[in-house]
């Protein structure tokens, strides 16, 4: 008869030990699952998020040949495209889209600047200059140090001069506008 209470205590002690081990291991297991298995659904971007780093300095000039730099445009969000001065139809479409992205920001549009980096000595056509109305036009005098695929992309540079996003030229305007609006709203203190 003395063995039954001892077995009962032993069984109860084992359950207590298992409970303590489970309580100790549960947070570690939960953190592992949260980090490696359950991916959060938020935080998705439409454009390609680039490694945030300053755009390296490179030689630029105005259309009349005066030296210029991106530092002159610090303090504004920049929508940057690069293309030849000849500006084919895809270039004209991108210039138009960049203007629409800026105008769609309403009262915040003063925080956004458009920049067309000309990659050659060709003078832009009247149609291209009309689409670029209000944009800064600078001639790149050396290779542009932005990530690859610049011919079919445009970029977003933050007010501190860091590359932030890359979008395809065929980007859906509504998605770009929504993302730019969200960026401006969440970063009111930097430009």
Map each language-model feature to its residues.
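N-terminal Lys/Arg-rich, disordered targeting/topogenic segments
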Residues: 1-11
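Hydrophobic membrane-insertion alpha-helices, especially the h-region
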Residues: 14-35
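N-terminal "domain-start" segment that seeds a small globular fold
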Residues: 22, 29, 38-71
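Extracytoplasmic
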Residues: 55, 73-76, 109-111, 149
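Short active-site neighborhood of thiol/selenol oxidoreductases, capturing the structured segment around
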Residues: 71-92, 98
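Conserved helix-turn-beta segment immediately C-terminal to the redox Cys motif
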Residues: 95-115
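Short, internal strand/loop/helix patches
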Residues: 112-160
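Thiol-/selenol-based redox modules, centered on thioredoxin-like
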Residues: 144, 159-191
